[in-house]
Amino acid sequence: MMASLMLNGAQNPKLINGIAPHGLGSAGLNIHNKCFFRKGVRRNMTLTCSISASRPASQPRFIQHKKEAFWFYRFLSIVYDHVINPGHWTEDMRDEALEPADLYDRNMRVLDVGGGTGFTTLGIVKHVDAKNVTILDQSPHQLAKAKQKKPLKECKIIEGDAEDLPFPTDYADRYVSAGSIEYWPDPQRGIKEAYRVLKIGGKACVIGPVYPTFWLSRFFADAWMLFPKEEEYIEWFKKAGFKDIKLKRIGPKWYRGVRRHGLIMGCSVTGVKPLSGDSPLKLGPKVEDVKKPVNPFVFLSRFILGAIAATYFVLVPIYMWFKDKIVPKGMSI
């Protein structure tokens, strides 16, 4: 039921082994392509997508501001595994999203960046020994939840910044980051770091949301956190120096591939590091100012808006779950 889109160098996208999502695809490309479905039916499809609202790293959205987001992370750690994941990041989605990462060797050294409560790490340690996995996150409250999970007891768990990783160059065999990029003030810097810490031939796998098409969802998304376009993911990987870049669409089964109604759908993007050393991309100093005092009135208003947005995005999948139960299979929802 999950639609898969593989993009090689952001060209020639094809939907494979899945259903065609409605209303989303590669923004700005206006691509017409042949799609092959499980039942052998071939159809023409036009891929279109909304454009995410650009914003400089110096003006982060609410949850992208590390200092303001501290309390959000603290609350999120309480409800993440039991409230957020069932609607937006299920075990089936996790396992399918990790498949392109090629976790085929239990002795691989794997970094789970933005690992939070360790939900994604639980999928990683199915294929790699826990002692070879490092979980990094900036939230001590999220990491405290990860430490409580028995399968992760042997993982190395550290606090850190995805945009300034505390690992040497050419360090890891695999870099995984799931549900984290939407919180980064400067995604390009984070993906550049992914390139740096990987060994030659190593693979990065970044899993995150895709910019919604519904106007109300776009409003909340632009105020709350980063929801990249599909081709933005590809562009960040290309600029960082990755090769063999591929993108795979993911989403809860009960969405039936639909990308309207304000739904958050996601993608898993992978790329291979072709050369040892740092990324060829040169960036200036970080512009995020975490030392600047927080205006309490601005913080309160942004916090309230963020809480409303969070509630909205929790309710939408519940609505779709009920709709999936009511509408007969095979019919559009």
Task: Report each predicted region and the residues it spans.
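Conserved class I S-adenosyl-L-methionine
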Residues: K203-E232
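A short glycine-rich, Lys/Arg-flanked "PGG" loop and its adjoining helix->strand segment in the class I
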Residues: Q188-K203
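A short SAM/SAH-binding and catalytic strip from SAM-dependent methyltransferases
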Residues: D173-D186
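Class I SAM-dependent methyltransferase SAM/SAH-binding core
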Residues: R109-L165
